[in-house]
A protein has these predicted regions:
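Adenine nucleotide-associated cytosolic modules
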Residues: 1-246
Length: 246
C-alpha cells in the first residue's frame, strides 16, 4: 500500500481504502465551535472529510481557551466559526471549510442540513437542540448529539434515515429551565475533548459505513470516577416532535 495522509485509516480492516474514500466524500454540519465542536471538527478535518460547515455566532473569549482548543490567544474577539475555519484550513487544506458567523434562521438551517450527510449538535443551548433535532428529523439526516456540564457528559446518535428512529425530544421530553452552562456550572476541560472526539468518531462511522453507531443508546460518563453507563431507549409514541401524525 502506498503511504499517504490517510494510510493509518486505510490499514484498519473495518475502514480500508473504500471506507476512507467514503469519508473523503462526506459532508458534515457542526453547530457550535466551542468545547465540543473544537475537537470534533479538528478530527473530522484531519480525517479528510470533503466538507465541514461550522456554525457559531459567538466570539472567542479568554475563558473559552481552557477547553475550546481550536482557538488561541491571537484570535481573541474573533468570531468562533471564522477562528475554527482558520485552524482547520491550517490542519488540512484539502477539506472545504464553510463558516457561518451568525445564528441561522429556520430556512437557512434547513438549507444547511439538507446539504450535509451527518450533523453534529455541539451547542450548549437547549432550545437550539430541539430546533436542530426537528430539522434533522424532517430532512432524514443522522444527528450526533453530546452535552457536558461540570464532570458529567453524554452522547448519542439519532439516525433519522430510519423512519422508526427516536429523536431528542423522545429522550428529553421536558426541557424548561434545564440550560446549564459552563459560565455558571463550570466544565472539566478534558471531558469536552473526550465527548467531542467521540462525536467525530460517530460521524466517521456513519459516513464511512463501518462499525456500529450509538443509535438507541445514550452513553453517559462521570469524569470524577471515569464511570460509564449506557441507557437504551426507543421512540416515544407520545413524543410531540416525532409521533405519528405530528
Amino acid at each position: 500500500m502506498q503511504e499517504n495522509r490517510y494510510s493509518r485509516h486505510e490499514l484498519l480492516r473495518e475502514v480500508g481504502i473504500e471506507g476512507q474514500k467514503r469519508i473523503s466524500q462526506g459532508r458534515v454540519l457542526i453547530i457550535g465551535a466551542g468545547g465540543l465542536g473544537s475537537p470534533a471538527s479538528l478530527y473530522l478535518a484531519s480525517s479528510g472529510v470533503k466538507k465541514i460547515t461550522i456554525v457559531d455566532s459567538d466570539t472567542v473569549d479568554l475563558t473559552n481557551l481552557q477547553r475550546q482548543v481550536i482557538h488561541n490567544m491571537e484570535r481573541l474577539g474573533m468570531n468562533k466559526a471564522e477562528s475554527a475555519k482558520a485552524a482547520l484550513q491550517a490542519i488540512n487544506p484539502e477539506v472545504e471549510i464553510i463558516s457561518v458567523d451568525h445564528r441561522p434562521g429556520l430556512e437557512e438551517l434547513e438549507n444547511l442540513v439538507s446539504e450535509c450527510d451527518v450533523a453534529l449538535d455541539c451547542t450548549d443551548n437547549t432550545d437550539s437542540r430541539y430546533v436542530f433535532n426537528d430539522v434533522c428529523r424532517r430532512l432524514k439526516k443522522p444527528l450526533v448529539t453530546a452535552g457536558v456540564v461540570a464532570f458529567d457528559g453524554q452522547i448519542t446518535v439519532f439516525d433519522f434515515r430510519d423512519p422508526d428512529s427516536a429523536c431528542y425530544a423522545c429522550l428529553f421530553p421536558n426541557h424548561e429551565g434545564k440550560d446549564e452552562k459552563a459560565s455558571t456550572k463550570g466544565v472539566f476541560a478534558p471531558l469536552v475533548g473526550m465527548l467531542g472526539c467521540m462525536q467525530a468518531a460517530e460521524a466517521l462511522k456513519i459516513i464511512g459505513k463501518f462499525g456500529e453507531p450509538l443509535t438507541g443508546r445514550l452513553l453517559m460518563v462521570d469524569a470524577r470516577t471515569m464511570t460509564w453507563r449506557q441507557m437504551k431507549y426507543r421512540r416515544d409514541d407520545e413524543c410531540p416532535c416525532c409521533s405519528q401524525g405530528k
